């Protein structure tokens, strides 16, 4: 039998043993875990300890395609191409210059060109820098075959724009190019990168945000030096840009291009009931694809320095004296203001003397004789409108009606860099030249000369207002936005009123009648005669200081005269004075109208209109 003291001692020892186990077991577990972390998984955790952030690389989205109004075949697509990138930090410093020189040789550029894109302070950076784009597959293959000698060099797909329909569409569609430093400064917070391709002109620029799409992302884990350490990055796929369907009809565009020919000028075909632009041609034009070429900078400078200014869209970016086409505004103002009875005649003796200056009508002495409004308009008598402007309206009323027609202000068409033209007033002249407005100034403006200026599109809007009897719809080139995958229409552009006049309906009817009378009994009877459709029009001949005995030729028209506005088109053509045959505007306009309503090609329209024998000047048409 054990003693009580022994039992107590044993019990105490057991408790100490249990306590020791409780203490030692977690300690040994901790030691084993520490051994595992330091020895077995040490490299893993050391990597994790250095992984302080993620690097996000942008995957460019395919740019959206552009279609004409029929949305069948694209006018602009993307073509496979590549870009080459340098990650400077991956190149051993002692080999940097050798690697870059070798890469430059493969890319057919100089080492200095690459050095300009990678300043010395970036040479240890692990950021990826694009050094060249628009590289063909063969060049990429050559680089790939020498990859071991080119550390830090990578490449990726970077499609280029392929403009399938060049020529006159260049001013409408525009072109793209690498984003500039100034552009990136403005756009960087909208998802653009230093490697982005952006629209430079035309639709490409106007709707760049829609065409860009949503770029994808490649997310990689990087260490403290910026070096990628993740084996497999996370990929977020890009979404292609929206497809844009334009209001342009490719067949009509081609017809207008051929009708204008190689004559410096512009022509616009507009649907007055909606504001849709069916065709817009400015000559000379250019090939948008040249900006994809190696020597694009050289070609751009050639275009920039060309005296005929092929980069300018004359339909919206140049303004001209509207000449006698402005007599539409003058006649409207006269009728609405009851400034002078339309049936009362004014005598034209071929000239007027005012302020010590002799003003000659285009029909010299003895002049047109006695003319009422209808015949004064149809014969485009300057004496008639000089009298109305100076004695019956005055510059303030003339300017007010000009602005009501949309002159002197933006047409708000969806194209960048348009001009507003000019509606001069006495106040404007005082501010501009510090000179008093004279009666002779009013006379000049009354026939669309002097300081008065307008774009071809503004004149198309003027004709649209006559056709619509007081309404101008906002001119536009975008018809629809479509999903690039499903082709579903996501947005349709609705007609939007730009200007609505309070001029009496009876006034519009009379203006329409005298425009029709101009075709049947006025100055352009021969070039505007048409058996297919009734045309209403007005000619214009603008004097140009730098050209002696040469003039800008205008023709503004709508057709059919006897149809409702929704079935009509408006056509405006200007042929500049620098052409060998500047009188072509009426002929070109009639060819366009004939081709559209007879569903004919240019050659067929010319033949049916009997214009094939025209080989010399026909004479001035006011």
Cite the ranges covered by each PLM segment.
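Beta-lactam-recognizing serine transpeptidase/beta-lactamase-like catalytic domain environment
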Residues: 2-6, 13, 75-76, 222-233, ...
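Periplasmic/cell-envelope proteins involved in peptidoglycan metabolism and beta-lactam response
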Residues: 1-295, 319, 344, 396-404, ...
């Amino acid at each position: 039998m054990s003693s009580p003291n022994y039992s107590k001692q044993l019990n105490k020892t057991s408790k100490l043993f249990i306590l020791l186990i409780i203490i030692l077991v977690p300690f040994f577990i901790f030691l084993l875990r520490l051994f595992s972390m330091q020895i077995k998984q040490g490299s893993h955790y050391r990597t994790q300890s250095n992984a302080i952030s993620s690097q996000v690389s942008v995957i460019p989205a395919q740019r959206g395609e552009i279609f004409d109004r029929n949305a069948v075949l694209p006018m602009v697509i993307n073509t496979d191409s590549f870009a080459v990138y340098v990650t400077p930090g991956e190149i051993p410093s002692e080999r940097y210059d050798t690697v870059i020189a070798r890469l430059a040789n493969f890319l057919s550029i100089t080492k200095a060109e690459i050095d300009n894109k990678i300043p010395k302070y970036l040479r240890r950076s692990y950021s990826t820098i694009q050094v060249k784009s628009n590289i063909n597959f063969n060049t990429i293959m050559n680089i790939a075959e020498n990859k071991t000698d080119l550390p830090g060099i990578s490449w990726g797909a970077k499609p280029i724009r392929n403009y399938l329909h060049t020529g006159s569409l260049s001013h409408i569609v525009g072109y793209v190019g690498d984003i500039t430093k100034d552009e990136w400064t403005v756009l960087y917070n909208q998802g653009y990168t230093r490697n982005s391709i952006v629209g430079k002109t035309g639709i490409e620029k106007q709707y760049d945000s829609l065409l860009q799409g949503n770029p994808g992302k490649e997310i990689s884990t990087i260490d403290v030096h910026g070096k990628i350490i993740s084996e497999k990055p996370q990929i977020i796929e890009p979404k292609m840009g929206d497809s844009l369907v334009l209001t342009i009809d490719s067949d009509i565009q081609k017809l207008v291009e051929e009708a204008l020919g190689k004559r410096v000028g512009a022509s616009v075909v507009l649907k007055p009931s909606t504001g849709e632009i069916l065709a817009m041609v400015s000559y000379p034009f250019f090939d948008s694809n040249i900006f994809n070429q190696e020597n694009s900078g050289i070609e751009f400078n050639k275009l920039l320095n060309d005296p005929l200014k092929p980069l300018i869209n004359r339909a919206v970016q140049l303004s001209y004296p509207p000449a006698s086409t402005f007599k539409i505004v003058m006649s409207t103002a006269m009728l609405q203001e009851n400034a002078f009875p339309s049936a009362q005649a004014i005598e034209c003796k071929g000239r007027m003397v005012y302020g010590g200056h002799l003003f000659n009508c285009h029909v010299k002495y003895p002049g047109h004789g006695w003319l009422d409004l209808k015949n004064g308009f149809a014969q485009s008598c300057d004496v008639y409108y000089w009298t109305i402007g100076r004695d019956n309206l005055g510059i303030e009323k003339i300017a007010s009606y000009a602005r009501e027609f949309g002159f002197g202000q933006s047409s708000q068409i969806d194209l960048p860099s348009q001009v507003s033209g000019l509606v001069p007033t006495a106040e404007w002249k005082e501010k501009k030249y510090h000179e008093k407005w004279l009666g002779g100034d009013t006379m000049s403006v009354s026939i669309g000369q002097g300081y008065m200026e307008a774009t071809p599109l503004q004149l198309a809007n003027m004709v649209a207002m006559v056709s619509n009897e007081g309404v101008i719809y906002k001119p536009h080139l975008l018809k629809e936005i479509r999903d690039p995958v499903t082709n579903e229409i996501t947005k349709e552009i609705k007609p939007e009123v730009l200007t609505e006049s309070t001029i009496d309906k009876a006034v519009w009817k009379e203006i329409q009648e005298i425009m029709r009378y101009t075709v049947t009994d006025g100055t352009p009877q021969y070039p505007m005669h048409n058996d297919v459709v009734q045309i209403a029009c007005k000619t214009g001949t603008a004097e140009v200081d730098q050209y002696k005995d040469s003039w800008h030729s205008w023709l503004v028209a709508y057709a059919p005269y006897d149809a409702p506005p929704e079935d009509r088109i408006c056509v405006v053509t200007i042929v500049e004075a620098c052409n060998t045959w500047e009188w072509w505007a009426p002929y070109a306009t009639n060819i366009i109208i004939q081709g559209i309503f007879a569903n004919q090609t240019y050659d067929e329209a010319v033949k049916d209109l009997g214009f094939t024998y025209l080989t010399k000047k026909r004479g001035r048409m006011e």
